[in-house]
Amino acid sequence: MDGKVDIVLNLSFKFLMKIFYENYWKERGRSGNRPRYRIFSQWIDEGSRVLDVGCGDGYFGEFLVNNRKVDYTGSDISDTALQTAKSRGLNVISLDASNDLDRFAPGSFDFIVMSEFIEHVPNSEEVLRIAGRIAKKGVLISIPNIAYWKFRLQLLFGNFPKQWAVAPEEHLRYWSVDDFKKTVKSIGFEIKEIKASNGKKILRDMWPNLFGFQVCFYLKPKSL
């Protein structure tokens, strides 16, 4: 009986997530260039096979294909986002990565990119574990940093920081840079590089946990 209840709850959650992100992309509209895209492209070898999880409307995918000549696959739960990504000439698939990422065999891709994605899923650690098996060379992630100095001030004065694009319920997980480092190390990754993509450069490079607004991680499974 408990197993049937779990299945029903899981299917219900998937359905609600699907509806939420269809509306999300309709309300948000198109994305644009982001500093983190340049960081990711510097980490990715030219010609690599790349899976972009939560690819959205494909702006990053187009940037990556044009600049690194990669074999690109984008995935997203939103058909609205995927239609826009397809219009950019990208190879994309419909995928609920919080449940179905394990459809790919180990070593299927050189790199997996999760750009401002992992905070949107409830089972972040499990998704990261699976990504570590699928990626040959590394998993590239960016997260919003809840310990950014402006957010600390907002909390000090009793206000929760606004990190979302459309609605507060889109973010299910929150990390500081130091918290995320502990999380990924606990599930078997080594951190090859950390780079903040927003904020004053000299400060964000020295103290990313304080002065990095969005922070990029180059992760490698310890077995690689």
Regions found by a protein language model. Name each.
Residues 2-111, 128, 173, 194-224:
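Conserved N-terminal segment of class I S-adenosyl-L-methionine
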Residues 99, 119, 148:
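Active-site micro-motifs of SAM-dependent methyltransferase domains
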Residues 113-122:
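A short SAM/SAH-binding and catalytic strip from SAM-dependent methyltransferases
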Residues 122-126, 151:
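Short N-terminal helix/helix-N-cap motif within the alpha/beta-hydrolase-1
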Residues 126-140:
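A short glycine-rich, Lys/Arg-flanked "PGG" loop and its adjoining helix->strand segment in the class I
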Residues 140-162:
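Conserved class I S-adenosyl-L-methionine
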Residues 162-179:
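Acceptor-substrate binding/catalytic loop of class I
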Residues 178-197:
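A SAM-dependent methyltransferase catalytic signature shared across enzymes that methylate proteins
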